Regions:
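Non-catalytic terminal regions of proteins
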Residues: 270-483
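Charged, compositionally biased non-catalytic regions
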Residues: 182-229
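Generic hydrophobic alpha-helical segments
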Residues: 79-83
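Acidic catalytic cores of enzymes that act on phosphate-bearing nucleotides/polynucleotides
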Residues: 209-292
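A general structural motif at alpha-helix termini
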Residues: 73-74, 111, 169, 211
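Generic detection of long, well-ordered alpha-helical segments
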Residues: 73, 101, 183-186, 261, ...
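Conserved RNase H-like, two-metal-ion catalytic cores of nucleic-acid enzymes
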Residues: 1-75, 85, 254-259, 263-298
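Metal-dependent phosphoesterase core characteristic of DEDDh/y 3'-5' exonuclease domains
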Residues: 21-26, 30-62, 85-201, 370-374, ...
Length: 483
């Protein structure tokens, strides 16, 4: 069995949507379990393509320009191929800061667009993934000693802890010159992990074990009757920082379709209103867009916990009386709310029916449709053939994919990576596609030309640094070169 290592990584991207925005830079450092570096750091850029516009805010923040990535980068197929290689080393735990919710999604969608299995590196050969953002939140909520906690003002003007990486490093004397450079952020993430491991080693090791879903599931005890289930603590960014990002929760139901999701109830909230609702009313309350909600909208404190996403779960015994008081937890009130749920004979049936109803989702372009279904074994074999074929062979071959998503992705894959192999007709089709996406906003466009221009005009009114202005000027020159 291979010795386990942690591959700490980070992306810089051209936007904030991992489904639709593209990667600009990737960096990573491999360590052993003692957080000592193993081997040399890796860092590379991805060449941009002409079917998307980099977001001006991304360029302003990172200072990475399309010209830089065009000059120093590699094509997207090679970019994600290299990333697959480092993640696929047996015994690798892929880790980062907010990586499960963002960076891992960038990886999955990048692999998918480039015919690489988007999930294999997460579980094959003893591999897994981890994310220390919730470790940081958990440390703050339960065992804050030994670490300096920076603060910020929340939306209600309340001073709360800030979990931004650059704020944590500054508060704890960790050098992070060049924040929003992928390699700098990776080094800072490792330093924060070392800090917690040093001051709260038991908590660090406990949370490290939660990267394995078979260690998480028993904590949520859904295998026993509802009346016997234990209240657990859950730490999540979905809970207010003013409450320590922490709430006591009661596990209710294993999602009947997605077995990795456990529906739980936040016991800070009285469940009476939810228990009185019909299934339709529960669905309406949960999924109605905020803009359509009226003053009669009743908050339903249901939360899905994904056992395969390294959730921060702990027994209530880990919360000292002092910390419980600090986070305004009234255990008598918590127990009253729990009893209401346990004593209701209909809630589990209602939730099962709610989960079984398939919600309609809008049209999704093939590039962003990774979660439109698993790839069949036959199509996966064809994907592997694509990966081992030369650009010249790809230009003379049209794989017989059963999946319409893959059929749509194939010509785009060739055009993005090897435009020189396109026929004249294919070049015209690619140009028309790019124009339709960027100018007309078709094909699930992330940022249209009009939106791009509007944001530039807004930024022109702000007090930009010389570096920011130079970066934006280069961005404009780049876009003018192909629009």
């Amino acid at each position: 069995m291979s010795e386990m290592t942690i591959f700490w990584h980070d992306y810089e991207t051209w936007g904030v949507d991992p489904r639709r925005d593209r990667a600009a830079q990737f960096a990573g450092i491999r360590t052993n379990l003692d957080l000592e570096a193993v081997g040399e750091p890796v860092m590379f850029y991805c060449k941009p393509t002409t079917d998307f516009l980099p977001h001006p805010d991304a360029v302003r923040i990172t200072g990475i320009t399309p010209q830089l990535t065009q000059q120093k980068g590699i094509i997207e197929a090679e970019f994600f191929g290299r990333i697959q290689e480092v993640f696929s080393v047996p015994g690798t735990c892929g880790a980062g800061y907010n990586s499960i919710r963002f960076d891992d999604e960038v990886t999955r969608f990048g692999f998918y667009r480039n015919f690489i299995d988007p999930y294999a590196r997460e579980w094959q050969n003893g591999n897994n993934r981890w994310d220390i953002l919730d470790l940081v939140r958990m440390t703050y909520a339960l065992r804050p000693e030994g670490i300096n906690w920076p603060t910020r003002q929340d939306d209600n003007d309340i001073e709360v802890a800030s979990f931004r990486l650059e704020h944590l490093t500054e508060a704890n004397g960790i050098e992070q010159a060049g924040a929003h450079d992928a390699l700098v952020d990776v080094k800072a993430t490792i330093d924060i992990a070392r800090l917690i491991k040093k001051h709260q080693p038991k908590l660090y090791n406990y949370f490290f074990n939660l990267r394995i879903k078979s260690n998480v599931a028993p904590l949520l005890n859904t295998h026993v009757d509802l009346s016997e289930r234990k209240v657990m603590l859950h730490i999540s960014g979905m809970f207010p920082a003013s409450q320590g990002c922490l709430s006591p929760i009661l596990p209710l139901l294993v999602h009947p379709i997605n077995k990795n999701e456990i529906l739980c109830y936040d016991l800070r909230h009285d469940p009476s209103a939810m228990l009185a609702m019909s299934v339709d009313e529960i669905i309406d309350n949960l999924y109605k867009p905020r803009a359509e909600r009226n003053e009669n909208h009743q908050h339903i404190a249901l939360k899905g916990i994904h056992i395969n996403k390294s959730p921060a779960i702990a027994p209530i015994s880990t919360l000292t009386d002092e910390r419980a008081k600090h986070w305004s937890i009234d255990w008598q009130e918590i127990d009253t709310h729990r009893q209401k749920l346990v004593n209701d004979p209909t809630i589990i049936r209602k939730l099962e029916e709610m989960c079984s109803r398939k919600r309609e989702s809008g049209e999704c372009d093939a590039d962003a449709n990774l979660y439109g279904g698993f790839i069949s074994n036959e199509d996966r074999k064809l994907c592997n053939q694509v990966l081992t074929s030369s650009p010249e062979k790809l230009s003379q071959w049209t794989p017989d994919f059963k999946s319409t998503r893959l059929q749509t992705l194939y010509p785009r894959y060739r055009a993005r990576n090897w435009p020189e192999t396109l026929s004249e007709t294919e070049q015209q089709q690619w140009h028309a596609f790019c124009q339709a996406r960027i100018v007309d906003g078709e094909y699930d466009c992330s940022l249209t030309a009009d939106q791009f221009q509007q944001r530039l005009e807004e930024l022109a009114l702000e007090d930009l640094t010389e570096r920011e202005q130079q970066s934006l000027n280069q961005l404009v020159n780049w876009v003018q070169g192909f629009l």
